[in-house]
Amino acid sequence: MVGCDKGMAADVLGRIADPVTVFGEASVSDVIAELGRGSRVLLLLRHSERPKIGYEDKTFGASLPLTENGKHLCVEFGRMLAGATPSVEFRASPLLRTVMTAELVAEGMGLAGAEVVRDALIGNGSAYVASELEVWRLFRDGSFFQRMGEYMQAGEQRGFNPLASATDAFEEHALSVFSAQLGVFATHDVYVAAFLHARGVKTDFNPDNWPRFLDSAAIVLRPDGERRYMLVRAGLSPLACGVA
């Protein structure tokens, strides 16, 4: 963690009655503006570009690295945030591509070597997942977008926990470990999309508007106690899926 204040996390959890605003889509410039006005911003960041994951891979590509372009995009994303605040912390789902994403974003921010905490609870061990094996079976036939659409619209899906309660638990955990002004928590598109849908930020996700690589769900904690939710479009990649 860089420049963190460990008293901040408890303060966030204590504000359970904060007014909430659903802001919609935003850019990295909007994130920087929020930091400039004293807000704290937690980015639930989709990892950068990776190769395609085979349908028979029960690990969901745990050992897949980022592509060379994906590495470059991470550094570019970090440069966009560089200097916005001296108080930054990094956390990642334990899969290789998410850890690499956080490390390379830190490098782009001028914070190479910053600690990246591995945290399964923002990855495939999160509150959203009831059974990793069942989720793999669900997506095995290539029907990822269809099955995710069903989950978000119905609030239930095989292999997943109920959307509403899972989102609450996911957010509670993320905020409980967030203690800097800016958090960069590298995770996966499944959880970014599910979170944004459940919070009412975007309820019409489909393959054309799916979170792209390095897009994120942002939780903004303003100094006056207001909590905002945003879909932050990085604008660095047109891709929703891995490359061949």
Regions found by a protein language model. Give the residues of each.
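Short helix/loop capping segments that flank catalytic or ligand/cofactor-binding pockets
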Residues: 53, 121, 194-195
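Short aromatic-enriched loop/helix-cap "lid" or pocket-rim segments at secondary-structure transitions
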Residues: 54-58, 103, 127-133, 197-198
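Active-site-proximal alpha-helix that buttresses catalytic centers in soluble enzyme cores
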Residues: 2-118, 149, 154-160, 204-222
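Short, solvent-exposed aromatic-acidic interface loops
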Residues: 231-241
